[in-house]
């Protein structure tokens, strides 16, 4: 049986620290921009923070309500806030503490399991089961927050830094934490997803995890750099980004996803998936992905080449030659290394499963609502 170990507890605590640090550095950026009279930059930075916070609170509330309405919920699977009503939970989330409540639940119960303060064997099994359900919900919320706040924040800061051709300490720290927060969310989500699938081997630690992480980080970095160059070329490139988002949202809508219990939340979910697809590839509904992935990364490479050509040929005055060569080299290297890591992972390191296609699919029997949500969410 998979166990919630001391290491898992410590990593969960580290994830909470990373989340708080990312929010704090972004808040520091907002204050810095306001002090420097950069009102637009401050407003955009604050907007990304608020959007990420608001969306995660909405989904966290909806999932708590779904769990409270679940007829099959057992006594040991209930929330650690039994005296709180639906209205009370909504009020707590209104103050933006939804993720903190979930971390409190997981760290409190996880401490008892990992450090052996829970005695009966059956109780330990129940707690293990509940803890991995909490981890599943948190991994999805952190992924949403990463692509609605951290990654757009990284794009904005890169655009500002490249445009000004200088980088302050606050900007450097903010970009670093946004980068690490996105990386943490990606790996944690991947591991939680595979752990939730009953007939699928867990994602191995060590080299496979490192290669998968590098694949995602390299491809996201090259994509963000390409978008930043397009924005430097013309601020009207935001129209192009909006079109890319609309295409991703339309594709998700065409797949008829059924992640949410309400139609309005389902439309919001599809719009968010469109944002995620703007920056990285995810298997939206467990269908075969080879052709879709090839098409996606071909277009990804095309956008990167286009952004470089536009700056080199039409607006070489916007960046110094040294800066342009540095960004071009970094973007090309990240694109190549990301695709190499992608091929290495899926050819040599991806866990093979018996009685299952290469891509995990929906429709399996589930043991908890949290794990059921996870299987219907996204497939990396």
UniProtKB/Swiss-Prot annotation:
InterPro entries the record matches: XK-rel, XK-related_scramblase
Species of origin: Tetraodon nigroviridis
Name by which UniProt lists this protein: XK-related protein 9
TM spans (from-to): 10-30, 39-59, 81-101, 167-187, 228-248, 264-284, 294-314, 329-349
Gene name in the database record: xkr9
Stated role: Phospholipid scramblase that promotes phosphatidylserine exposure on apoptotic cell surface. Phosphatidylserine is a specific marker only present at the surface of apoptotic cells and acts as a specific signal for engulfment.
Keywords: Cell membrane, Membrane, Transmembrane, Transmembrane helix
Recorded topology in the membrane: Multi-pass membrane protein
Catalytic reaction equation(s): a 1,2-diacyl-sn-glycero-3-phospho-L-serine(in) = a 1,2-diacyl-sn-glycero-3-phospho-L-serine(out)
């Amino acid at each position: 049986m998979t166990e919630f170990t001391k290491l898992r507890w410590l990593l969960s605590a580290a994830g909470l620290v990373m989340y708080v640090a990312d929010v704090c550095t972004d808040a520091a950026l907002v204050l810095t921009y306001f002090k420097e009279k950069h009102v637009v930059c401050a407003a955009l930075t604050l907007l990304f923070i608020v959007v990420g916070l608001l969306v995660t609170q909405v989904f966290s509330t909806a999932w708590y309500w779904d769990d409270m309405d679940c007829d099959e919920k057992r006594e040991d699977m209930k929330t650690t806030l039994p005296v709180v009503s639906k209205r009370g939970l909504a009020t707590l989330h209104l103050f933006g503490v939804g993720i903190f409540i979930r971390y409190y639940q997981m760290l409190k119960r996880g401490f008892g399991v990992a450090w052996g303060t829970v005695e009966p064997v059956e109780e330990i099994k129940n707690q293990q089961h509940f803890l991995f359900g909490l981890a599943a919900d948190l991994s999805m919320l952190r992924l949403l927050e990463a692509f609605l706040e951290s990654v757009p924040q990284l794009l904005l800061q890169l655009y500002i830094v490249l445009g000004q051709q200088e980088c302050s300490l606050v900007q450097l720290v903010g970009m670093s934490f946004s980068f690490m927060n996105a990386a943490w969310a990606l790996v944690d989500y991947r591991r939680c997803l595979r752990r939730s699938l009953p007939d699928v081997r867990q994602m191995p630690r060590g080299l496979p995890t490192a290669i998968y992480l590098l694949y995602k980080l390299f491809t996201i970095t090259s994509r963000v750099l390409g978008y930043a160059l397009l924005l430097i070329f013309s601020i009207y490139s935001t129209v192009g980004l909006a079109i890319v988002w609309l295409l991703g949202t339309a594709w998700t809508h065409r797949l008829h996803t059924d992640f949410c219990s309400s139609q309005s939340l389902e439309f919001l979910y599809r719009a968010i998936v469109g944002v995620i697809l703007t920056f990285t590839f995810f298997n939206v509904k467990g269908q075969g992905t080879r052709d879709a992935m090839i098409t996606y990364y071909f277009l990804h490479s095309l956008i990167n080449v286009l952004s470089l050509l536009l700056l080199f040929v039409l607006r070489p005055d916007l960046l110094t030659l040294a800066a342009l060569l540095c960004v071009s080299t970094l973007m090309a290297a990240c694109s190549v290394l990301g695709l190499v890591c992608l091929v290495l992972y899926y050819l040599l390191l991806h866990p093979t499963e018996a009685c299952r296609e290469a891509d995990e699919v929906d429709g399996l029997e589930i043991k908890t609502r949290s794990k059921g949500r996870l299987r219907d969410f996204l497939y990396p």
